[in-house]
Amino acid sequence: MTMNCEAVVQHLVTWLREKVEEAGARGVVIGVSGGVDSAVAAVLAQKAFPDNCMALVLPCESSTEDLIHSRLLLDRFNMPYRVVELDNVYQLLITKLESYIKLDGSKRRLLRANLKPRLRMTTLYYSAQARGYLVLGTTNKSEITVGY
């Protein structure tokens, strides 16, 4: 099967513009993780909204490699971005919550792991609302595959 990649890109860019306009927004905020899914979405967002696209890199006990990949992508495509370190917020919240919620083992690990994307989500929505933008969400194909 032959695919016209430029036509697919143009279709997605047009769709993004339509959805943002329908919502009465001016652009998009996107979280860039250093992975393939957010990289593709970020480049599409930049094409759709060259002057109204903000990328956020939101490390929270993340690998240095993820941060490097994110910055390389964003610099390569000349996208405006901010790095918002969430480590301290995460640790503070864990300390407060676990002072009265006693858990151990796998349940504790799961709750801690789930808190990280929720902190990122809150940060993305705060930033988007402040600008009159929408959050351009990204999926993670490997998470979908395993049912996360």
What does each of the following model-derived ranges do?
Residues 1-147:
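ATP-dependent adenylation/nucleotidyltransferase module used to activate substrates
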